A protein has these predicted regions:
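Solvent-exposed interhelical
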Residues: 175
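Membrane-helix and juxtamembrane interface regions of eukaryotic multi-pass membrane proteins
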Residues: 3-6, 10-169, 180-248
Length: 248
């Protein structure tokens, strides 16, 4: 019996190791791929800006029009698909259960892909635009998002599921903003789409933040989440109001 118990304990120890190795086997290629994306943006960004006329659209010193179009598949398709696949892999138990699983084991290719993808996607703009050409509000937005992402994915990992869903909500608003900035010809439809989509996006993000806060034990952690969500949603909504007022 002791030998069987020892064998079971040994197998129990080996299973997390095997899971970790599996995740590394997924995470390493993803990391290399994301680095290659940054390198590609660094090499192709300036020529693309030159060919397409550089920064265009409603916002001065915003992303180039080609960058806005390029972002849409990731914002509207890839991130939601990653969430759905990861959620189904856990038996569709809900965002809270996903967060608890992530806090315990830090495993799952869909989760790791999101963890790596989101900050890399934001870093692209630093390579494409450069610090000197970025709007201050855009720079503040990107830095805040990257810092918040690291905090939500690791120190406060129990809220990972709700955080992931909140990012999808925010990226939906950024997606309709990109459609507006892309300059599609059917104005004022895109203006109304931007204003309505951003409002819905911010409300959904606040809903997710409310549930995320319930997973955080420390008061300081809750305060960080409330402040970051509040600042981001207010900034985004103000920009949407300004664009709506100017364009209608």
């Amino acid at each position: 019996m002791p030998r069987n118990d020892d064998a079971a304990a040994k197998n129990g120890k080996q299973q997390p190791i095997a899971q970790a190795l599996t995740d590394r086997a997924v995470a390493v290629p993803m990391t290399l791929w994301l680095i290659s994306v940054l390198a590609l943006a660094f090499c192709l960004g300036p020529p693309m800006n030159l060919v397409t006329g550089g920064v265009q659209g409603f916002f001065s010193n915003g992303p180039p029009r080609w960058r806005a179009a390029w972002a849409l598949p990731t914002q509207m398709v890839l991130m939601p698909v990653l969430f759905v696949l990861g959620h189904r892999a856990l038996g569709s138990q809900g965002p809270r259960a996903w967060g608890l699983q992530w806090a315990r084991e830090r495993r799952g290719p869909n989760a790791w892909c999101f963890v790596l993808l989101f900050p890399t996607w934001l870093l692209l703009d630093f390579f494409i635009l450069g610090l000197e050409d970025m709007r201050p509000i855009m720079l503040l937005h990107h830095v805040t998002c990257i810092v918040a992402h690291m905090i939500a994915c690791f120190p406060f990992a129990a809220g990972f599921g709700w955080y992931f869903l909140g990012v999808i909500s925010l990226e939906f608003g950024s997606g309709v903003c990109n459609i507006f900035c892309f300059g599609w010809p059917w104005y004022p439809l895109t203006t109304y789409l931007y204003f309505a989509g951003m409002t819905i996006s911010n409300l959904l993000a606040c809903y997710c933040a409310y549930h995320w806060v319930q997973t955080v034990q420390s008061r300081s952690g809750r305060l960080i989440g409330i402040v970051i969500t509040g600042v981001l949603t207010v900034m985004r909504q103000r920009e949407a109001h300004r664009a709506f007022a100017v364009s209608t």
